C-alpha cells in the first residue's frame, strides 16, 4: 500500500550543527527590515539574478532532486505525490521564468491610494507595505521554494521556509542558488531562510515564534493544514484541499463539457485545481454520461457514481460520502446526477472546499446565479478548472491558493502579501487646540 507524505514527521536527515529555529527567525526578521526599503529596481535586478542562478545551478539541483525522488520511490510514495516532487530541466526553466515574471510586475510596496482631505484640513491616505516575515510550511513541491521566495521578496517580505521531508535535498539546492543571487546583490541571505532540518520539532517551534513571524502559510495535505491551524500561535492563511467540481447544466454545450472534463481531470491530476467530482443535470445525463465514460475510460480514469449514474453506466463502482469529500489527486473521479441547479449548489456547499468550481452552461442567468451562489475562491464559467492558477489569472507566480477568506481568498500574488497603513499629512492641524 502506498504511503502518504507527512511533512511534519521526524526523519534522521538533518544538519549536524545545532539548530535554533528562533535564531533563524530572528535573522529573518532583521533582514525584513532591510527588504522593506529596497528600491523596486534593486528587487527586480535581484529577482532576475535569482532566475539566472537557478538555471546556472540546474545540474546540482537535478542531482539533489534525484536523491529525493529515489528515496520517495523506495518508500512507496503515491505516484501523484512523486509527480509534485520531480524536477526536470523544463520545470526548472519554468521556475526561473516565474521569477522573471515577478520582476516584470508592478511593485505594490509604497503605493498610495484613496487620499482624501478631511474637514480638519489633514490629508489621509493609505500606503501599501510588506507584511514582514512570512513562514511557509509546505510538502514535496520544491518549486514552492523558489516561488515563495520570489513573491515574498518582491513584496518586501522575508520568508522562513520549512519544506517537506521528502524534498529536503531539492529545497537545499534551490535555496543555495537563490542565496548566490542575494549575496551578489548585497541583500542579506537571511531574507530567504530555509530551515535545514526535517525534524518535526522545528515546525512546532516555528509555530510559536509570534515575536518574529507575522504570518504562516501552510501548503500541503489535509493533515498538515489541520496540524498547523490547530497548533500555530501566529495567524494562518490556509491553503486547503481542492475538492473541485464540474457541473454540467441542462443548457450546457456537451462538447465543451467534454473538453473541460478531460483537461480538468486528466492533464495533471495531482494538482489542487484538478477536478474531483462531476455533477450532471438529469436532463442531459442520458446523453452526456456515456460520452464522458468513454473518454474517461480511454484516459484510464476510474469513475465512481451515485445510483442514477450506475444505472446509466453499468459496471461503475458506487461512490460513498468519503468519495464526494475526497481530494483524490489521481485518476479517480466521483460523479452524481442532480435534478436541479439547487441540488448541484447544495452538493457543492456540503462537499466543496472553497477552492475552485466550474459550471458548463449556455444560459447566462444560470451562470450568473452559480457565480453568485457558489462558495469558492475561484469560479469559472465554461472554462477549465486548471485556470485556477496565479500565472493564468495574471498574478505571476503564486504563493498558493487561499481557502481562508481573511486576509486573502484565492490565488495569492504580490498584493496579497502586503497590507496597508494610514499615512496622514498636515500643516500643523491639531484636534483640540490648546491656548498657549
UniProtKB/Swiss-Prot annotation:
Classification of source organism: Bacteria, Pseudomonadati, Rhodothermota, Rhodothermia, Rhodothermales
Designated name of the protein: Gamma-glutamyl phosphate reductase
HAMAP family xref list: ProA
PROSITE patterns: PROA (PS01223)
NCBIfam families with a match to the protein in the record: PRK00197.1 (NF001221), proA (TIGR00407)
Entry keyword annotation includes Amino-acid biosynthesis: yes
Gene Ontology BP annotations: L-proline biosynthetic process
The keyword Flavoprotein belongs to this UniProt entry's keyword annotation: no
